[in-house]
Amino acid sequence: MNVSVPLPSGGTMTEPDFSVLRQSMIAEIAAKTAFVSTQLGKAVLDPRVMNAMAKVPRHEFVLLELRPYAYADTPLPSCFDKTISQPFIVAVMTDLLELRPTDTVLEIGTGLGYQTAILAELAQHVYSIEIIEEMAVQARQRLARHGYTNVDIKIGNGCGGWPEHAPFDKVIVTAAPDLIPPPLIYQLKPGGKMVIPAGLPNDQQLILVEKDASDAVSTRDILPVRFSLLEDAEPG
């Protein structure tokens, strides 16, 4: 299943170098998707998601010293003891949302903006909440530099959602509470989907939440995962 991601032998990396690494990342995501096809219910992710992953320059959304490793399929350290998610998990979470070009999306946990950029490629508008001010500022700068004008970021605790812009077609959460915050379910439109990691630190699951036309809510565990805890949502 493993597809090796070549790293440069030395010297300054160029855009063509990053492009080659990005294509290797895409191949590894495809291989891992096939490997967990039973859990995902599919062996191939939506081509629109894969195209977005192939387009967005992940090296522009990681710390400068980690750029050579931007396309390795692994989480990377970010600011303030946070991490940027593994590309495979980014792709799976995005695919589970089944985004449409007309969708408005609520993202909890902007980080440095990589997942936000993927969402912005596929949806009409992204409303993203980041609790750490410096990370929110950096994300705004990075997203603006790459022309993403369909994103609004606010600084705050994402557990309460963003009522002023609710309801949302889709919700994605990039840090894990022990339980799904009720406001995020309330702010999901009928027919909407939410993807969220949840559970105790050593027992987290990636969960797909669906709300039907009558507001009935169902959940499905997808994969075991390990995420940073959602701020102000520690266990207990």
Curated annotation (Swiss-Prot):
Gene3D superfamilies: Vaccinia Virus protein VP39 (3.40.50.150). The active site is at S85. PANTHER family: PROTEIN-L-ISOASPARTATE O-METHYLTRANSFERASE, PROTEIN-L-ISOASPARTATE(D-ASPARTATE) O-METHYLTRANSFERASE. Transmembrane segments: none annotated. This is Protein-L-isoaspartate O-methyltransferase 1. Keywords: Cytoplasm, Methyltransferase, S-adenosyl-L-methionine, Transferase. Belongs to the methyltransferase superfamily. L-isoaspartyl/D-aspartyl protein methyltransferase family. GO terms for biological process: methylation; protein modification process; protein repair. It comes from the Bacteria. One of its GO terms (cellular component) is cytoplasm. It is found in: Cytoplasm. Its EC number is 2.1.1.77. Catalyzes the methyl esterification of L-isoaspartyl residues in peptides and proteins that result from spontaneous decomposition of normal L-aspartyl and L-asparaginyl residues. It plays a role in the repair and/or degradation of damaged proteins. GO terms for molecular function: protein-L-isoaspartate (D-aspartate) O-methyltransferase activity. It comes from Polaromonas sp. (strain JS666 / ATCC BAA-500). Pfam families: PCMT. It catalyses: [protein]-L-isoaspartate + S-adenosyl-L-methionine = [protein]-L-isoaspartate alpha-methyl ester + S-adenosyl-L-homocysteine.
